[in-house]
Amino acid sequence: MAAAAAAGSGTPREEEGPAGEAAASQPQAPTSVPGARLSRLPLARVKALVKADPDVTLAGQEAIFILARAAELFVETIAKDAYCCAQQGKRKTLQRRDLDNAIEAVDEFAFLEGTLD
């Protein structure tokens, strides 16, 4: 009887797959995997950039990580917007003019106007 119920379609076991697959598809907490890279930018490089500011004397690891993550998100956002500009020109390769167009088109990037000149 139990075998017939398990063989039916739509059972939780069939939808989830083996326990290993279900666990692998779930996002892991950052601290659960030792040595996992949490940031794509090298934290030592970000820390060196922060310390290059003469007004900064100390910078904690958490602050460095947050700055690195914010920089990643910023670059991702501007790259996506610039890529949309490239696609409008029927191109796949980003060019400087695509960044200029993205800066002009998106209000959040207004502070960058004139920086690429």
From Swiss-Prot:
One of its GO terms (molecular function) is DNA-directed DNA polymerase activity. It is found in: Nucleus. One of its GO terms (biological process) is DNA-templated DNA replication. The modification N-acetylalanine is found at residue 2. Keywords: Acetylation, DNA-binding, Nucleus, Phosphoprotein. Residues 19-30 have a biased composition (Low complexity). Residues 1-36 are annotated as: Disordered. The modification Phosphoserine is found at residue 25. The modification Phosphothreonine is found at residue 11. InterPro entries: CBFA_NFYB_domain, Histone-fold, Transcr_DNA_Rep_Reg. GO terms for cellular component: ATAC complex; epsilon DNA polymerase complex; nucleoplasm; nucleus. Accessory component of the DNA polymerase epsilon complex. Participates in DNA repair and in chromosomal DNA replication. Component of the DNA polymerase epsilon complex consisting of four subunits: the catalytic subunit POLE and the accessory subunits POLE2, POLE3 and POLE4. Interaction with POLE3 is a prerequisite for further binding with POLE and POLE2. This is DNA polymerase epsilon subunit 4. The lineage of its organism: Eukaryota, Metazoa, Chordata, Craniata, Vertebrata. The gene is POLE4.
